[in-house]
Amino acid sequence: MTPMRKTNPLAKLINHSFIDLPTPSNISTWWNFGSLLGACLILQITTGLFLAMHYSPDASTAFSSIAHITRDVNYGWTIRYLHANGASMFFICLFLHIGRGLYYGSFLHQETWNIGIILLLTTMAAAFMGYVLPWGQMSFWGATVITNLLSAIPYIGTDLVQWVWGGYSVDSPTLTRFFTFHFILPFIITALTTLHLLFLHETGSNNPLGIPSHSDKITFHPYYTIKDILGLFLFLLTLMTLTLFSPDLLGDPDNYTLANPLSTPPHIKPEWYFLFAYAILRSVPNKLGGVLALLLSILILAMIPILHMSKQQSMMFRPLSQLLYWFLIADLFTLTWIGGQPVSYPFITIGQVASVLYFTTILFLMPITSLIENKMLKWT
């Protein structure tokens, strides 16, 4: 008798995606992060839903409603810190997922890659809006500084900023619309994730060797479900350790002070996962140039399939490209560190050098290195 999972239309859909899915037999732990991102999304939607039940999206009550959630709501502090640290874990998994895609050449599945870039941008938008909601000092000034960047757009910039703010400054209307978008975006992310999976299953997963694996595939269940569950346990262990022992480790102390439009914090900075892009933004003296550099720091990912010059998909057997790849990772760590430092010498210079190296490595050094490696293949 045919199992129901192969006959029922809905069960068949789940079966083809998570049970009988043909998967390369040699994919490593680096392929775990896709499922972890799914777990992060479920966690964020669940905790966010409970927080939204008690949150008040108004400038006069937002800060006190967060204090109320933390102090008075049953396990409110747990839900709040799971949500805040869950966002950090989300971005850690996201960066590792993109890093794996770059290393093993998964970007050659272009539709999947491009939807992934849209997912990254949407997630960044959701996280930024979420950071504004507690209405602390860093929330308020972060919102003011980042939304003010829209004024760099010629002709329509100023009108656009006032339209986003809902007035002449960041206030209650801004908070209300940010809360609205922050609530709806995770559901848009879920829809985009479904599309991402749909296109991925059209081509099948890549593998560490970067070669076709049609002749050597195994079913996703039980082999990779067990592997993913192990990854999920390690993820939850890390998240719970962070939440229960150091919940404010990745946050900013300034956000425990009520937003005050008359007092600017000594150093305005976003959450740690945006610091690399913030450092690139600050490295350009011109406002419009900085905004363009900020956008390009993410959108440059869309150019990577075009810049791929190697005859091999994966970097597994390309030592020179591997060297450049790890140089790029080190450069991103440097940018993240610089983004959290004050705007003074020598941090400005280091940030500018790191920003130039970031774009130079991706646009010029990596394609040239790939061409050199192609030549080296002929010599062997």
Swiss-Prot record:
Keywords: Electron transport, Heme, Iron, Membrane, Metal-binding, Mitochondrion, Mitochondrion inner membrane, Respiratory chain, Transmembrane, Transmembrane helix, Transport, Ubiquinone. Heme b b566 binds at residues 97, 196. Signal peptide: none annotated. It is found in: Mitochondrion inner membrane. Its cofactor is heme b. GO terms for cellular component: membrane; mitochondrial inner membrane; respiratory chain complex III. Heme b b562 binds at residues 83, 182. The chain crosses the membrane at residues 33-53, 77-98, 113-133, 178-198, 226-246, 288-308, 320-340, 347-367. Heme 1 (or BL or b562) is low-potential and absorbs at about 562 nm, and heme 2 (or BH or b566) is high-potential and absorbs at about 566 nm. Belongs to the cytochrome b family. This is Cytochrome b. It comes from Gorilla gorilla gorilla. The gene is MT-CYB.
